[in-house]
């Protein structure tokens, strides 16, 4: 009952007018307390008066005011009692509806606040003679006798928690701010302006606006407050209201998903992602469909180390509606074209379907089929027109291979590259570097090459003959490709080099290590040359390149060419069709296109590119032939039918159809001989022919008349 009476008196007292400073006894001398938007008295006039609940009352008179402020001096309370607490030299009740309730939610009944209201904190150890609640923004603070610590708030702090009294003096006296005032941001227990979030630490913090819980400067790596663990620099996404990491710390990789960003270990870049190392901009865990380093529409990928170019990965699975290309470097739209390897076609799925674009690394042939190499259909090359890959004919006359622009790169035997054209060699040459008889680089079978002074080309003529004197041969003991070469020189100080005798001193590059040369032969050849039948030969020049592929060191052949054997510098020519042999009559391995029969090799059937077991059992078909999966023995011409597969007349290169049903996949149709390659129509050609006949006839008639008339004259 007394409590209710006391509360009623207090509330009646508070119903007085707002704090004003006056000089009369019982009036407020100093309005020094601000609670919320209101001001209250902190010092009164008159010896018997002191502030209770922010107003001046007579605290000498017995009653509730004296209970709340039992001790006073000089217009201020020096001790509080009951359910009050001291704040800025006044005693305040913590009851609801009173100004003190905004400072303290409960007190201990002996004049000390035990639970501070939001925006304030209760210093540990405060007595009823000391201020026992401090504003979070009070930077002056209060010194508590017990322990001697001065407890302070933080400038512009709106909410906080009390310092840890057990911590050191310096660490334990400042409150921990949990929310700053309006327009301020909490950073490292300091309330700062928004622009100061990144002061001195570029992009290490971000300003996060939060009107409910308070604005904060959040460290990029503070995952407990919305940051990203192991993040080095970041930004704030206003749309998602999330911190977005822009660079992870060393040895971590930035991964971005629909849920946000994270920093992960390298081995976690999987399941639709792959790692990219970048010491400058930061390592990244990129999605397989990354527009720069990934593959469009790729869902599952694998990192390719050391690859140069745009894509750093190969794709093993694509998103719906797409499939990996043959080389796994792109994702291609899934089509319903029945032509194998076809990406786009007209009359899709019908009998008259025509493929217009191939997928992956395959090329569109002249017959609208898809093939992995244009060289398989003859003198064609792979070209790119826009986004399409096409097989185009190498139109340069006598050209063996063209580049992807159609420019001739190598000429057929008997021709040499002359600018963009192929010009004929001299009739005595098999291959040449120019058009004269002394420009031969290889000779026809049975003819020997004699190099000129520069050692790069020479003349083709009859094989080795014996004689005496300088440059003559004593023994013609080497035969290569039907032509004989010298194996022992007539002059003992000379030796055969590439089959020709000359002294060591006359060589532009000495190829024999013997010093001096003795007996007209070389005992040890230099590196990059190999010894053969008394002479030294090169693997890059004829005739040496015919018999040896590699001779890097030691002056001996390390790898003989197919069809030859070199044993201690002595050449053995294997039998026909033999790739490797123990002797000239004992073959151990046959060349492609031959099959082993006892110790010899038998040529495969004409329909076979390779055969196995018997000459007519094709392992791979020759150009112009095909073989069905169920077919045995020889291959079938592209023009003929076999085991349910239909051939196509005039087809020069083909493959069996899928599932071995229907027509062959024809890659090239032969020229019938009536093709008009000039581009003129048949009518135009006929008109020109008639005109030529008329002109020629008229000219002959005129000449006859002229001579007859002159004869009469």
Curated annotation (Swiss-Prot):
Keyword Signal: yes
Keyword annotations of the record: Cell membrane, Glycoprotein, Membrane, Repeat, Signal, Transmembrane, Transmembrane helix
Residue intervals on the Extracellular side: 18-679
InterPro entries documented for this protein: EGF-like_dom, Furin_repeat, Giardia_VSA, Giardia_VSP, Growth_fac_rcpt_cys_sf
Spans through the membrane: 680-708
Main location: membrane
Residue ranges that the UniProt entry lists as topological domain Cytoplasmic: 709-713
Effect annotated for changing residue 582 to T: In strain: Adelaide-1
A single Gene Ontology CC term: plasma membrane
Documented effect of changing residue 606 to S: In strain: Adelaide-1
Sites where a glycan is attached: 289, 676
Entry membrane topology: Single-pass type I membrane protein
Compartments, record wording: Cell membrane
SMART domains: EGF, FU
Pfam families: VSP
Signal peptide: 1-17
Annotated domain remarks: Contains 29 repeats of the CXXC motif.
Sequence similarity: Belongs to the Giardia variant surface protein family.
This protein's name: Major surface-labeled trophozoite antigen 417
Species per Swiss-Prot/TrEMBL record: Giardia intestinalis
Gene that encodes the chain: TSA 417
């Amino acid at each position: 009952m007394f409590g209710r009476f006391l509360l009623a008196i207090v509330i009646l007292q508070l119903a007085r007018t707002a704090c004003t400073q006056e000089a009369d006894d019982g009036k407020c001398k100093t309005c020094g307390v601000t609670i919320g938007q209101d001001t209250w008295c902190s010092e009164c006039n008159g010896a018997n008066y002191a502030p209770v609940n922010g107003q001046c009352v007579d605290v000498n008179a017995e009653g509730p005011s004296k209970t709340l402020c039992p001790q006073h001096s000089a217009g201020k309370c020096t001790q509080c009692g009951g359910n009050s607490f001291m704040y800025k030299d006044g005693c305040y009740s913590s009851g609801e509806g009173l100004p003190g309730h905004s400072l303290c939610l409960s007190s201990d009944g002996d004049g000390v606040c035990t639970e501070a209201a939001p925006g304030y904190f209760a210093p540990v150890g405060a007595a009823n003679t000391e201020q026992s609640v401090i504003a979070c923004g009070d930077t002056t603070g209060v010194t508590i006798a017990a322990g001697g610590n001065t407890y302070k708030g933080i400038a512009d702090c709106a909410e906080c928690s009390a310092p840890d009294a057990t911590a050191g003096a310096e660490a334990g006296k400042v409150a921990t701010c949990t929310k700053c005032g309006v327009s301020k941001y909490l950073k490292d227990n300091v309330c700062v302006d928004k622009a100061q979030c990144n002061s001195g630490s570029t992009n290490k913090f971000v300003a996060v606006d939060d009107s409910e819980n308070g604005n904060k400067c959040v460290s990029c790596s503070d995952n407990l407050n919305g940051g990203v663990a192991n993040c080095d620099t970041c930004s704030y996404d206003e749309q998602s209201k999330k911190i977005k990491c822009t660079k992870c710390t060393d040895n971590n990789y930035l991964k971005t998903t629909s849920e946000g960003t994270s920093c992960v270990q390298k081995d976690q870049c999987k399941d639709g992602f792959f790692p990219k190392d970048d010491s400058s901009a930061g390592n990244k865990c990129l999605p397989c469909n990354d527009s720069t380093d990934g593959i469009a529409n790729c869902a599952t990928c694998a990192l390719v180390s050391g690859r140069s170019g745009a894509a750093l990965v190969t794709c093993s699975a694509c998103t719906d509606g797409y499939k990996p290309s043959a080389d796994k470097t792109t994702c291609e739209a899934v089509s319903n074209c029945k032509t194998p390897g076809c990406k786009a076609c007209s009359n899709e799925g019908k009998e008259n379907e025509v493929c217009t674009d191939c997928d992956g690394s395959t090329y569109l042939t002249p017959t609208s089929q898809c093939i992995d190499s244009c060289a398989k259909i003859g003198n064609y090359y792979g070209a790119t027109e826009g986004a399409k890959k096409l097989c185009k004919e190498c139109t340069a006359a006598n050209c063996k291979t063209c580049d992807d622009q159609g420019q001739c790169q190598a000429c057929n035997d008997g021709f040499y590259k002359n600018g963009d054209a192929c010009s004929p060699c001299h009739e005595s040459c098999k291959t040449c570097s120019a058009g004269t008889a002394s420009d031969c680089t290889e000779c026809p079978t049975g003819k020997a090459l004699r190099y000129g002074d520069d050692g790069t080309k020479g003349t083709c003529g009859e094989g080795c003959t014996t004689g005496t004197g300088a440059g003559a041969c004593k023994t013609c003991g080497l035969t290569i490709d039907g032509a004989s070469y010298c194996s022992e020189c007539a002059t003992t100080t000379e030796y055969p080099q590439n089959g020709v005798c000359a002294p060591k001193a006359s060589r532009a590059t000495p190829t024999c290590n013997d010093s001096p040369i003795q007996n007209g032969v070389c005992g040890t050849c230099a590196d990059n040359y190999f010894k053969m039948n008394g002479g030294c030969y090169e693997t890059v020049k004829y005739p040496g390149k015919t018999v040896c592929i590699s001779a890097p060191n030691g002056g001996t052949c390390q790898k003989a060419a197919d069809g030859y054997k070199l044993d201690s510098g002595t050449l053995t020519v294997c039998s026909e069709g033999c790739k490797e042999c123990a002797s000239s009559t004992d073959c151990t391995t046959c060349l492609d296109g031959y099959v082993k029969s006892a110790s010899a090799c038998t040529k495969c059937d004409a329909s076979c590119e390779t055969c196995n077991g018997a000459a007519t059992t094709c392992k791979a078909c020759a150009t112009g032939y095909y073989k069905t999966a169920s077919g045995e023995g020889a291959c079938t011409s592209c023009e003929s039918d076999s085991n349910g597969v239909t051939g196509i007349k005039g087809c020069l290169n083909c493959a069996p159809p899928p599932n071995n049903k229907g027509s062959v996949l024809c890659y090239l149709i032969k020229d019938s001989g009536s093709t008009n390659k000039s581009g003129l129509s048949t009518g135009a050609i006929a008109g020109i022919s008639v005109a030529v006949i008329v002109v020629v006839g008229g000219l002959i008639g005129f000449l006859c008349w002229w001579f007859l008339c002159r004869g009469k004259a």
